[in-house]
Amino acid sequence: MVKISFQPAVAGIKGDKADKASASAPAPASATEILLTPAREEQPPQHRSKRGGSVGGVCYLSMGMVVLLMGLVFASVYIYRYFFLAQLARDNFFRCGVLYEDSLSSQVRTQMELEEDVKIYLDENYERINVPVPQFGGGDPADIIHDFQRGLTAYHDISLDKCYVIELNTTIVLPPRNFWELLMNVKRGTYLPQTYIIQEEMVVTEHVSDKEALGSFIYHLCNGKDTYRLRRRATRRRINKRGAKNCNAIRHFENTFVVETLICGVV
């Protein structure tokens, strides 16, 4: 701050000593004072514009990155739903067949062909098999579910439109992962290597009223159908033609061999 003062002109050189004494004493300043304040140094405007521009650039860059990440997420979800899941569904569905020697129907071994559609659900740990009408006889068409979570097997005999439930036989039925690996290994060919057939016999024991207790997979298969429990016959016996009249056969495979399931005592 700069201070500038203006003193008034002296009226005369001569003066009384008393006047000098009084003049030497401090008196209210009658002088006119002007205060000058130095101008503040202003920052160059270009610095503000640069700082504002840099902040705006960061904001735009951040928004662009967010939009890019959202686009990548949506693209990943789209690819997963429409390509990966579709490919996974194709890999878990098999339409295959097997050639085997039939030693059960007659004493002469004849070559037979069995076809079936297989759906394997690895996450849910169950298998669903559809056996169409055999071309050369030998069994009924059926839908079969092997539920490894519940430890149950359900047969839906399409000809009779009835369901039969029994404990899962893990010595015959491969687990979903093992069965999937087997079918993937032979997927390049149409048929599995020629194999053989074994037989198991079931007996109807009781009617099932509470189908929900069988689990959701078997419930959806057997809902609205008469459902019965089965008991596996401990001793094998030769089924003659007369005894076979009261038995229904379902031929299927969930292993490297074919299984003929005889359901006897059919209501």
Swiss-Prot record:
Any GO MF annotation of the entry: amyloid-beta binding
Keyword set, alphabetical order: Cell membrane, Cleavage on pair of basic residues, Disulfide bond, Glycoprotein, Lysosome, Membrane, Phosphoprotein, Signal-anchor, Transmembrane, Transmembrane helix
Pfam families listed in its UniProt record: BRICHOS
Membrane topology: Single-pass type II membrane protein
Species in which this protein is naturally found: Homo sapiens
UniProt-recorded name of the protein: Integral membrane protein 2C
Record's subunit section: Interacts with BACE1. Interacts with APP. Interacts with STMN2.
Record-linked PANTHER family: INTEGRAL MEMBRANE PROTEIN 2C, INTEGRAL TRANSMEMBRANE PROTEIN 2
Annotated site, Cleavage, chain positions: 242-243
Residues where Phosphothreonine is found: 37
Gene of this entry: ITM2C
Annotated BRICHOS domain residues: 136-230
Subcellular location field: Lysosome membrane; Cell membrane
TM regions (residue ranges): 55-75
Residue pairs linked by disulfide bridges in the UniProt entry: 163-222
Family classification: Belongs to the ITM2 family.
Expression tissues: High levels in the brain, specifically in the cerebral cortex, medulla, amygdala, hippocampus, thalamus, caudate nucleus, cerebellum, olfactory lobe and spinal cord. Very low levels in other organs.
Lineage: Eukaryota, Metazoa, Chordata, Craniata, Vertebrata
GO biological process entries: negative regulation of amyloid precursor protein biosynthetic process; negative regulation of neuron projection development; neuron differentiation; positive regulation of extrinsic apoptotic signaling pathway
SMART domains hit by this protein: BRICHOS
GO cellular component terms attached to this protein's record: extracellular exosome; Golgi apparatus; lysosomal membrane; lysosome; perinuclear region of cytoplasm; plasma membrane
Biological role: Negative regulator of amyloid-beta peptide production. May inhibit the processing of APP by blocking its access to alpha- and beta-secretase. Binding to the beta-secretase-cleaved APP C-terminal fragment is negligible, suggesting that ITM2C is a poor gamma-secretase cleavage inhibitor. May play a role in TNF-induced cell death and neuronal differentiation.
Post-translational modification: Type I membrane-bound, as well as soluble, furin has a pre-eminent role in ITM2C proteolytic processing. PCSK7 and PCSK5 may also be involved although to a lesser extent. The soluble form of PCSK7 is incapable of processing ITM2C. Fails to undergo shedding by ADAM10 and intramembrane cleavage by SPPL2B.
InterPro entries linked: BRICHOS_dom, ITM2
Glycosylation sites: 169
